[in-house]
Regions:
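Glycine-rich phosphate/diphosphate-binding loop of Rossmann-like nucleotide-binding domains
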Residues: 1-21
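Active-site-proximal loop->helix
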Residues: 2-3, 7, 26-31, 74-88
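Generic helix-packing signal
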Residues: 6, 34-37, 105-112
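Short coil/turn connectors at secondary-structure junctions
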Residues: 8-11, 36-39, 59-63, 86-91
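C-terminal binding/interaction regions
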Residues: 13, 76-141
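Short beta->alpha connector loops at strand-helix junctions that form conserved
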Residues: 16-18, 45, 66-69, 93-95
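Short glycine/serine/threonine-rich phosphate/pyrophosphate-binding segments
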Residues: 23-24, 45-54, 73-76, 101-104
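Glycine-rich phosphate-binding loop
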Residues: 29-67, 71
Length: 141
């Protein structure tokens, strides 16, 4: 996630918080995030994966949940935990693992691009690079 934001010159804050092991810190973080100028929160969680939902219940800031692969259920437990939010407490849920993490950052960048022309130009350039890379691929005969 940080590499993606760095590519687009998007400032970010990274922090390790656990919904189960540091609940007071989690609530404090969520409640004070808006006051620090944070506009979006990406929360990765594995297993019971309560972090994204608990953060979403404590702030009006959009929360994006990324399921982290787990040893026993390969992240399916995390995915189901994050995606099954009750109505009224939304969490945008992404794919399990690295693809979900990268896409969550790109989703934030896409939202920022709607009101930031510089970010929009970088996003268009990024997607053009992706397109070019695919078009240049060769299949082995």
């Amino acid at each position: 996630i940080s590499k993606v934001f760095d590519q687009f010159d998007i400032p970010y804050e990274a922090k390790v918080i656990s919904a189960h092991r540091t609940p007071d810190e989690m609530y404090d973080y969520a409640k004070k995030a808006k006051g620090r100028g944070i506009q979006y929160i990406i929360a990765g969680a594995g297993g019971a994966a309560h972090l994204p939902g608990m953060i979403a219940s404590s702030t009006e800031i959009p929360v994006l949940g990324v399921p982290i692969p787990t040893k026993h259920l390969e992240g399916n437990d995390s995915l189901l935990s994050i995606v099954q939010m009750p109505k009224g407490v939304p969490v945008a849920t992404f794919a399990i693992g690295e693809a979900g993490a990268i896409n969550s950052a790109l989703f934030v960048i896409s939202m920022i691009s709607t009101h930031n022309e510089d970010v929009e130009k970088k996003l268009v350039k990024y997607r053009e690079k992706q397109k070019k890379k695919v078009l240049e691929m060769k299949l082995d005969s």
